[in-house]
Structures are given as C-alpha cells and as structure tokens.
C-alpha cells in the first residue's frame, strides 16, 4: 500500500486504529530506545510519514506539517488546525510499556480550549493515557481514556501562556506516572487503568489550534 493511499485511509473522522495494525510493519521496542522527530524533512501541508491521525469522539482533525519561523528546530512544526472532541496524532510502529514521551508545543488559538498534550500506552482511538497543558485554564492535567470516555486522574495549576513554546514531558514505569512542564514536575501519580505496551503521540481538545515540534519518545 503506497504512502498516499495509507494516509487517505487514516483520515476518517472517528478513526479507531488498533495497535496491532499500527505495528504490523513495525518493530517492538524491547530494549532501551529513544528518538526525536522534528518534522523538518516532511512536505509542508501533509500528514508526516509514519503518523496516523484521528479523533476520540467526533470531529474533523487536521494535522499538517507547516513552516514556522519560531519553531524550536526550524523550519517546520506539526500543526493541528481542525476541530473535534479529542484530536490525536499517533506515531505508528511504536510499542512502549515503560519509558517517556516529550514534545514542545505552542497554543495558538481556540475559544473553547487551547490545549497541547501527549498520549502513551495508546491501544486505539478509545483507550490510552493523556497528559495535557491548557493555556486557557493555566493548568496541567492527567487522564486515562477507556472505551472512548476520558477520566480525570489529577490536575494542577501551572502557568501556560499562549503563543509561547513549552515543553511537556511524561515519564511512565509500571503504575508510576510523572508529568513535567518546562522542566518542573507538576504531577506524580500511581495508576493501572491502561497497562501493557502501546503507541505514543500528540493530542489536543475541541477547537485548539496547536503547533508541536521536537517530539521525543523512548523506552526503558
């Protein structure tokens, strides 16, 4: 299946890609591994190779590579400019049980929400963990999504000014989850709702228009 055909199949509004399908041509990360992706070699205006977009709930997500002079690693960023309940973009060929995920993000616009987040242990569009920072509410939150329903584990007030770059990082091992924003740990929590390996990716909410760059992930 060609890349163009693959990307067209990924753009269903209520996409639920099972992890097994995402890993069909990939490799499992059994040993320590890390990678950083800057989107700088991908074509502007397209969904980057090896990524799958979708939404938990309803809506029309739109994840595209765009030029941005303010990008932490120039020249490109990955921008979510569509709208949906919870739009996500997942790196396929990844399967991490214990490790980390990190991204730089900038909240650009949104009247209902201005959020940037990361997902991990992603099984499909309805089952995963998510941590996000919100520029409208000025807080950092930790959730799990199960059977398509998002549940709050913890949220903490934190400064998240819009139109500025921030670094969101999550470290996870067994039940332990640590969420940091701009190098400061805001949440440490134990939870076991989503166990076992899963994919990693990025996440937004509602009408958030958010730019992402330097997406990093690794296994322990």
Task: Please name every model-derived segment.
Residues 39, 101-103, 164-179:
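Short tryptophan-centered beta-strand motifs in secreted/extracellular beta-sheet-rich domains
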Residues 80-142, 146:
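Secretory/extracellular carbohydrate-interaction modules
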Residues 146-167:
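Short, aromatic/His-centered strand-loop micro-motif at the edge of beta-sheets
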Residues 194-220:
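Ligand-recognition surfaces built from glycine- and aromatic
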Residues 16-29:
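Bacterial N-terminal signal peptides
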Residues 46-77, 84-85:
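Extracellular glycan-recognition surfaces and repeat-rich motifs
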Residues 180-199:
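Short, solvent-exposed beta-strand-to-loop segments that form ligand-recognition rims
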Residues 33-55, 213:
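Extracellular carbohydrate-recognition regions
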């Amino acid at each position: 299946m060609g890349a163009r055909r693959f990307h067209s199949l990924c753009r269903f509004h209520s996409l639920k890609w099972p992890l097994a399908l995402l890993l069909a041509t990939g490799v499992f990360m059994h040993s320590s591994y890390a990678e950083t992706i800057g989107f700088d070699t991908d074509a502007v205006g397209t969904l980057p190779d090896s990524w799958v977009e979708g939404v938990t709930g309803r809506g029309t997500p739109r994840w595209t590579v765009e030029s941005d002079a303010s990008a932490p690693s120039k020249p490109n960023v990955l921008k979510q400019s569509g709208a949906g309940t919870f739009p996500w973009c997942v790196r396929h060929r990844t399967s991490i049980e214990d490790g980390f995920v990190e991204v730089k993000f900038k909240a650009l616009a949104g009247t209902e929400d201005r959020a940037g987040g990361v997902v991990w242990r992603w099984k499909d569009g309805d089952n995963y963990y998510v941590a996000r920072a919100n520029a409208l509410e000025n807080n950092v939150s930790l959730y799990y999504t199960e059977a398509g329903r998002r549940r709050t584990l913890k949220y903490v007030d934190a400064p998240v000014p819009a139109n500025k770059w921030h670094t969101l990082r999550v470290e996870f091992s067994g039940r332990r989850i640590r969420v940091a924003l701009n190098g400061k740990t805001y949440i440490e929590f134990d939870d076991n709702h989503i166990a076992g390996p899963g994919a990693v990716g990025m996440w937004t909410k509602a009408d958030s228009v958010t730019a992402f760059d330097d997406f990093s992930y690794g296994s322990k």
